[in-house]
Amino acid sequence: MMHAELFAKNVALQALIEKLRAIVGPDAQLHMDSRTLKAGDVFVACPGLVGDARTYVEAAIQAGAAAIVLHVESIREWQDRSASIPMFGVENLKTRVGEFADSWYRQPSADLCVVAVTGTNGKTSCVQWLAQALRVEGVAVGVIGTLGVTYPDGMAADGQLTTPDVVSMHRTLAEMRARGAKIVALEASSIGLDQGRLDGVRIRHAAFTNLSRDHLNYHLTMQAYEAAKLRLFTHVGLQGVVLNVDDPVGVKLARTVEVPTITFSLSRQADSANLTAKDLSTNAHGTAFVLCAHLECVKAQTQVLGAHNVANLLCVAGLLRQLGWSLARVGAAFEKIHPVSGRLQRIQPILSHTPSPTVIVDYAHTPDALERVLRTLHGIAQSRSAKLWCVFGCGGNRDAGKRSLMGAVAQKLADRVVVTSDNPRDEAPQAIVADIIVGLASGAANVLIEVDRAQAILHAVLSADAEDIVLLAGKGHEAYQESNGQRVAFDDGQWAQAGLILRQECSIQTDSRKLDAGAVFLALRGDNFDGHDYLEQVAAAGAVAAIVDQADTSVALTQIALGDTRAALLMLGRAWRKQFALPIIAVTGSNGKTTTKEMIASILAAWVGESNRLATTGNLNNELGVPLTLLRLRRSHQVAVIELGMNHPGEIAILAAVTQPNVALVNNAQREHPEFMV
């Protein structure tokens, strides 16, 4: 066995660090996840809430770890350990990881002004807008939060957690320092605070936005949830806090914190607040208000929507004031900030020849957040005599108690509600939907259940009137859908763009060699070809956009990324077909279906006219051809005949679900394609 040594819980960790530095290289990093470390790094193994990293020591060694630092609970446990690389045990390491990581990275937060924001809703908007305001003034600022990590030079890295694990936190802060950051704005989640992910971080300024129901699957009670949030305000070294005194928790904090405090309020009753906003005016393009600090006031014209976002801006104003900004400087910066990705984000249509509804994507996934967003959009919709649509679901393996509450909020404030899926994770989507509809009035005519989220989005975008507003709530910036232990590409904004482009009635084409100018190219992958290789060619041919699995930013062509494009084509064809209340005849069979389809097409043409009936052309009768045919449907069509072919089991069921025929004709069933019927 290689070198092994146990450090008692009362031993200074500096001795461990010195021993490690003598073993590993100067660029070695600490990692708590064996999957992320690189050769020469140090694996820090502690038990977690669900798993235990100590069971992955061998995986870390196989990945090239140079040393192991292990949480140890007893001497006997340590005596049973062995490894082929240097290993160090630390009693109660789990409670000292923050201290260890801080020392390893040479106290990065001591050289930074770290600003942390906590609260149920608004954390992401606050830290992003704080960073935007600071960048306007040329301040080198980094961000850590739900949207990932952004360094002062603009480089970004994805993040799995709102608040990264404690080792990743200190490693990231060290990288921020190395890249020249002066200020780091971070989101402090309740779970992150409860699990000590900010341990060892020197936080200078902390802010509280609000508290409402969320994460009770983890905290179990609102009291425990609140207590986790309040841990942020017990950090040693705090120099100032910013509090929302429209929230009872903010009022409580204002009475107990012992550092300089700035309070903010939107309520007219809260005359004692340090910062307030008056004369709010919101339209589809933004919100104007008067920002006041007691007797001093400045006007602010912003691009953000809603009173709840004005409250978030007040929080940002409080933090900027604590950083030494004048009120006028704050107001000027607010005019230059832009909406945060996935937070009341308007999806701008690629084309606008035909008027389209206003589509908004928002991360609202709690009853309170959904209500705030819907109230904002409801007012805008009412001002133009339009309807408000709400497409939403609830996440699996999360607080089930909020599902019915969100259903009730949606039905109360939206004119049309589409209940769907939102990261079902390990739960059955139908079971989650069943929980949601408990909160809906029975027999509600304004509610549609569509479990498939892509279909739900397409239905709302395609069915809404041009003056309407369509809210896609719950996923916001997320570019995935998580189900059954897998994450697949899924972006609400991209599916909304697909619906908006369909409304323009562009031709959807898959052959780059024959593409018409003004068409939308759908890139397919086959055994011997990849349509994504021809994006530059179709751009030169005049394509207005391309539907792709993943955007290629090197090509100067607008792209709509929908993941698997074959599956997306079926989705688009199905959704578009649903927009037409006309008779459709489906023809299938082993032999004679094309001849039968042509005879029916001739009869239909004689009945309603050639241009008023749609029929399958050529051999477009499979999982590619059928949706492409359905996407040719136009308002002038009165009837259609669609040929359905099959060369593998289950294909007819798929095509029938897409076509949704009123009349089905099966010619015969013979022994065809036996090589595929297995």
Where are these regions (language model features)?
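Short, conserved loop/helix-junction motifs that constitute active-site signature segments
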Residues: 62-63, 80-82, 199-202, 232-237, ...
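Active-site beta-alpha connecting loops in nucleotide-dependent enzymes
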Residues: 48-51, 340, 367-370, 375-442, ...
